[in-house]
Design a protein with these regions (language model features):
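Conserved N-terminal beta1-alpha1 strand-loop-helix module at the mouth
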Residues: 1-85, 94, 104, 152, ...
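Hydrophobic faces of well-ordered beta-strands that scaffold small-molecule active sites
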Residues: 13-18, 41-43, 67-70, 89-90, ...
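Conserved N-terminal glycine/acidic-rich loop preference
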Residues: 16, 81, 119, 135, ...
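Short, ordered loop/turn segments at secondary-structure junctions
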Residues: 45-48, 72, 94-96, 114-115, ...
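Histidine/lysine/aspartate-rich catalytic loop segments that bind and position anionic ligands
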Residues: 88, 92-137
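Glycine-rich phosphate-binding active-site loops on the catalytic face of alpha/beta enzymes
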Residues: 88-98, 132-140, 172-194
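Short, charged, surface-exposed secondary-structure boundary motifs
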Residues: 98-102, 120-125, 140-143, 166-167, ...
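Shared catalytic-loop signature of beta/alpha-barrel
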Residues: 121, 142-144, 148-156
Length: 211
């Protein structure tokens, strides 16, 4: 189970995936998500300034946030993310070198995987949680099927998770879910409609809690 000095990622505690187009919006996005109850936030490193944004959010927002770096592709990126203050690491695929760096630094790793072989490999290598990606096409039934022979592995469906299916993923046995564009909506962000983002975050938190 993912543990950290500030706490741990709880079951059914949704993880927001933030992909930034504008560095200046990082704090506002994070603040709006936090106001809606989402305290675990992953900044995808697809933007070259994502680590700078993560550090900025850490400086300016309350300490009850758990901020991580996503799309970590190798050990070098993992070390850079940790140096920038990332409190957990997320990979899009099973990348053992990233898991090793995270474990050595005492930083939780959500390792990407899809097939049962990859899922078991990530877990045995030391991943704290296993991110099942892409999960949308496979659906909740896939999570249930995988957990049949592999019970006890904390799975985090990612990719294609939305308000319509997040409860079903959890009912199928997922530990929690990670949510990208269906939460951090590009149109909402473009228009800077932060109250709308907060309300959407609240809806996801409620859906996860009551599923």
């Amino acid at each position: 189970m993912a543990k950290h000095a500030k706490g741990k990622i709880q079951p059914r505690q949704p993880i927001a995936i933030v992909r930034l187009d504008d560095l200046e919006q990082a704090v506002e996005i994070s603040r709006a998500l936090l106001a809606g109850g989402i305290t675990v936030q992953e900044f995808a490193l697809t933007n070259p300034h994502a680590l700078e944004a993560l550090a900025q959010v850490q400086r300016r927002l309350p300490g009850d946030l758990l901020l991580g770096a996503g799309t970590v592709l190798d050990a070098e990126m993992a070390r850079s993310a940790i140096a920038a203050g990332a409190e957990f690491l997320v990979t899009p695929a099973f990348l053992p070198d990233v898991i090793v760096v995270g474990r050595s630094a005492g930083i939780p790793v959500l390792s990407g995987a899809f097939t049962p072989t990859e899922i078991l490999g990530a877990w045995r290598t030391g991943a704290d949680l296993v991110k099942v990606f892409p999960a949308g096409g496979a659906g909740p039934a896939y999570i249930k099927d995988v957990l049949g022979p592999l019970p006890g592995i904390p799975l985090v469906p990612t990719g294609g998770v939305n308000l319509g299916n997040c409860a079903a993923f959890l009912a199928a046995g997922a530990y929690t879910v990670a949510i990208g564009s269906s939460l951090v909506n590009k149109e909402i962000v473009r228009k800077q409609e932060w109250p709308a983002l907060t309300e959407l975050a609240r809806q996801f938190v409620q859906a996860c809690a009551t599923s």
